[in-house]
Each structure stands twice: as C-alpha cells, then as structure tokens.
C-alpha cells in the first residue's frame, strides 16, 4: 500500500531488533513508501551484533557513558541507505533503537533539513530515563503509551500498536484455559498463585510462567518459574489458550501487548488494567477487568465460547504514521 502523506515522501523505521518488535511494527513492511530496518546495525555477524549490544548496554551506559560509540556510524543500517536530500523523510526510532544509536549520529540526522525525527517509547520512561533524556532534544515528535509519562515529561500520547503475524486457531485446538507470562512480585504474586489454584480446582488448566519470584516462594507445583520464553513461544501459547491473563503492577497504565494479543487473536482477557475500559472492545463481554482478586469470575475464564471482537486493524502502526503526518509542520 502507498501511504498518502501531506508532509513525507518516505518513512524509515529503525526497529529494535526483537521478535516482539516485529510483531508491533511489521505492518509498516507493507507500505510502499516506507523502509523497514530490522535493527540499528546492518550486519548478520553475531559477534559484531554482540559487541554492539555490549557497547550500548542500557545498564552500563545508564551509570557511565562508554567512550567511542561514534565509531559504529559506518555500521548503522540507516547510514547505508544514503538518504535522498531531495525527499521529505520521516525517521522513526523506538526508545530501544534510539538508545542503541550514538547521540552524535542522532544529532546529525536531526540537523538534516529534509528529515523529521520521531521517537516512540514502548517502555515507561523510568526504565531508561538517563539514556532517553540525552537524546530527546534530537527528536521533533516523541510518543508514549503511558499517560503519566506524557504528563510528566511533556510527551505526546499514543496507545501501543500491534501487527497481526499469525492466523487464529480453531476453537477445538485450544489447549489451556488461562495463560500468563511475566514478572510476579509483591501483590501480583499472591493474586497469580491464588488464580492458578482456583482454575485448577475447577478442573481447568492454567499455564503460568512467573519470573522474579523468591526462592522460598517457588513451591507451587505446575507453575513454571524463571523459564524464559521467546516471543514466538509466547504467541504459540496465546494462540492455544482460552483466556489471556494480565496482572499489572501498581502505577502502571496504558494498553499492553497482552491486551492487544487477546483482542487481535480473539481471546478472552482477564486484567486489572483500567485502561481497557477506554477501548470499544470492552463492551464485547470478552474482557473482565477486576479491582480485587475476589472480583475474578473463574467461570468466565474456563467457559469455552466463540470469541470475536470484530477487530479490523485498529492497533496497526499504520495509524501512527498517519498521526505523525498530522502533527508534522
């Protein structure tokens, strides 16, 4: 498809290089006047990729800026594109791909007269605050899915987005009643363990992957502790479950990957995320939003029924490109 834009002749997307990043952004690959770069550097050499990853380590560089990062310039995928100075170009980074790019190179791109720089935060600002703060001035538009971050840092709000990468699974191929994967700390841990056992007691099947659990609390048989899943593995399990479970920590807000997966792939959703009430899909009856564990209806989780949200590309990143074009000057 050709994106009809008032301000840009070409879009360049610098993706974060992860499989979940592909799931979020891959619709852009279908846009004729867009270039999709899978990662910051253009190299299949795993040693080089590892060295780049270490040199731009979020943990290390948040404490002390490692020197000589500008040496990566000639490896940047975007540098090899040779941006046409006669075209109006929009370059989009995520917070992750921006933080894996040298600040001086971002400054160089920002100074090009025909380029508009956009950053899209797919994580809360707190997670990489120091690194992002160094780069903010080199972006013309900055978006976040988190309303609190938008209010605190003066960012533009845009809900998270998602691209369909799988075909839906037939109802008779559903293997579990509930699926959860994520960090399980504090209040979340007690909610999740109780929910797991409540489902199992009804004869249902729950598949929970919990991380961040203290050794003394890893005693619930049937729960998977600290078992890493690739995003492909996560999607495999989402496709085969009846209900996706999402338990948010205190202070978190905004639409999440789990919620979008449930809606896009027609799964029931159990969540304590109040943000889902703002969605038109909330009235479908396939989403249960609870305040306390006592509010959870186990029958909602285990009862099998055909789920259809009538989803029609509502979360596609194509709409973000349209928004960016609207906000451009």
Predicted features by range, described:
Residues 1-122, 141, 276, 317-318, ...:
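N-terminal pre-catalytic "stem/leader" segment of glycosyltransferase-like enzymes
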Residues 18-20, 126, 143-151, 210-216, ...:
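Short, polar loop motifs at secondary-structure junctions
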Residues 28-38, 48-57, 139-143, 151-164, ...:
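Active-site regions of enzymes building and remodeling cell-envelope glycoconjugates
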Residues 79, 196-214:
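A conserved nucleotide-sugar
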Residues 84, 135, 236-237:
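Structural alpha-helical scaffold elements that stabilize or flank donor/cofactor-binding regions
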Residues 87, 138, 239-240:
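Alpha-helix C-terminal capping/helix-to-coil transition sites in glycosyltransferase folds
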Residues 98, 103-200:
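Catalytic core of nucleotide-activated saccharide and alditol-phosphate transferases
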Residues 208-322:
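Donor nucleotide-activated moiety binding/catalytic core segment of transferases
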């Amino acid at each position: 498809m050709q994106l009809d834009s008032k301000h840009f002749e070409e879009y360049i997307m610098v993706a974060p290089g992860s499989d979940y990043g592909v799931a979020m952004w891959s619709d852009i690959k279908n846009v004729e006047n867009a270039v999709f770069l899978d990662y910051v550097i253009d190299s299949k050499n795993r040693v080089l990729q590892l060295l780049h990853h270490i040199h731009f380590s979020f943990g290390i560089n948040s404490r002390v800026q490692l020197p000589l990062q500008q040496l990566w310039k000639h490896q940047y995928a975007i540098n090899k594109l040779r941006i046409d100075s006669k075209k109006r170009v929009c370059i989009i980074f995520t917070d992750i791909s921006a933080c894996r790019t040298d600040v001086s190179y971002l400054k160089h791109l920002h100074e090009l007269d025909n380029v508009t720089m956009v950053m899209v935060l797919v994580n809360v600002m707190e997670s990489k605050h120091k690194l992002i703060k160094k780069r903010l001035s080199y972006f013309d538009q900055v978006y976040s899915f988190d309303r609190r971050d938008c209010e605190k840092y003066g960012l533009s709000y845009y809900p998270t987005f998602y691209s369909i990468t799988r075909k839906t699974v037939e109802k008779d191929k559903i293997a579990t009643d509930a699926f959860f994967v994520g960090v399980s700390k504090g209040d979340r841990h007690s909610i999740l363990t109780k929910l797991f056992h409540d489902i199992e007691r009804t004869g249902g099947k729950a598949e929970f992957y919990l991380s961040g659990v203290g050794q003394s609390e890893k005693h619930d048989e049937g729960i998977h502790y600290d078992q890493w899943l690739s995003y492909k593995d996560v999607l495999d399990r989402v496709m085969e479950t009846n209900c996706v479970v999402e338990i948010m920590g205190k202070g978190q807000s905004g639409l999440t990957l789990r919620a979008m997966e449930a809606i896009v792939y027609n799964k029931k959703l159990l969540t304590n995320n109040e943000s889902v009430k703002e969605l038109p899909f909330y009235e479908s009856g396939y989403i249960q939003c609870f305040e306390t564990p006592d509010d959870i209806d186990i029958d909602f989780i285990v009862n099998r029924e055909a789920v259809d949200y009538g989803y029609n590309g509502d979360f596609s990143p194509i709409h973000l490109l349209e928004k960016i074009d609207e906000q451009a000057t």
